[in-house]
């Protein structure tokens, strides 16, 4: 990686990690991160090789003589197809499905309101939009399943399941909860 710091002897901090996100985080966490990005206010921007789940390219780093090449693939369409395995393809397809779904939900308009919920670690909670069309985003950023209490019946737009009461949220799982048009 590349490091930055001051000559005065202050602590040195990483500037860039020089690692492919899929290799560092794994495909499940990468999909969660991309989905969180789509859940936030504004217009999400994605780095194509990360969406594709490109692994570290150790050969490129060695051949080019610098670490930055590890996550900057130069591929033809044919070689890109060879690199992508089923897990990466299904993760990419799931992200595309989620982004298409996002486009249909008014709460995810780039200018829609956003409020951060005060939840216990490792849960992250965000409310997007306004009632009755708001969406509550719940993400488990930890490594163990954790429980979240859904106060009123809601529909998880991602899993297409009705949820209510105490719900177990798996590691790297993200929920898009909507109460619009839900009858108890």
Residue spans of the language-model regions?
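Residues immediately flanking
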Residues: 140-141, 179
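C-terminal beta-strand-rich structural cap/linker in extracellular carbohydrate-active enzymes
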Residues: 165-184
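Solvent-exposed beta-hairpin/edge-strand motifs
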Residues: 151-161
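Surface-exposed beta-strand/loop patches in extracellular or lumenal glycoproteins
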Residues: 141-153
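Loop/helix patches that line or flank the sugar-binding groove of alpha-linked glycan CAZymes
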Residues: 1-135, 143-145
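Short conserved micro-motifs at the rims of enzyme active sites and ligand-binding pockets
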Residues: 57-60, 148-150, 166-168
């Amino acid at each position: 990686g590349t490091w930055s710091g001051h000559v005065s002897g202050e602590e040195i901090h990483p500037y860039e990690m020089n690692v492919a996100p899929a290799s560092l985080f794994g495909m499940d966490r990468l999909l969660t991160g991309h989905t969180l990005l789509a859940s936030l206010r504004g217009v999400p921007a994605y780095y194509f090789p990360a969406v594709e789940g490109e692994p570290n390219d150790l050969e490129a780093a060695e051949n080019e003589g610098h670490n930055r090449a590890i996550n900057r693939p130069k591929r033809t369409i044919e070689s890109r197809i060879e690199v992508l395995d089923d897990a990466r393809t299904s993760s990419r397809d799931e992200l595309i499905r989620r982004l298409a779904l996002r486009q249909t939900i008014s709460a995810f308009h780039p200018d829609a309101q956003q409020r951060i919920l005060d939840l216990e670690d490792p849960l992250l909670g965000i409310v997007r939009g306004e009632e009755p069309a708001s969406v509550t985003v719940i993400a488990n950023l930890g490594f163990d399943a954790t429980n979240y209490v859904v106060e009123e019946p809601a529909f998880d737009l991602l899993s297409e399941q009705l949820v209510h009461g105490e719900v177990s949220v798996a590691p790297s799982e993200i929920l898009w909860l909507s109460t619009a048009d839900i009858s108890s």
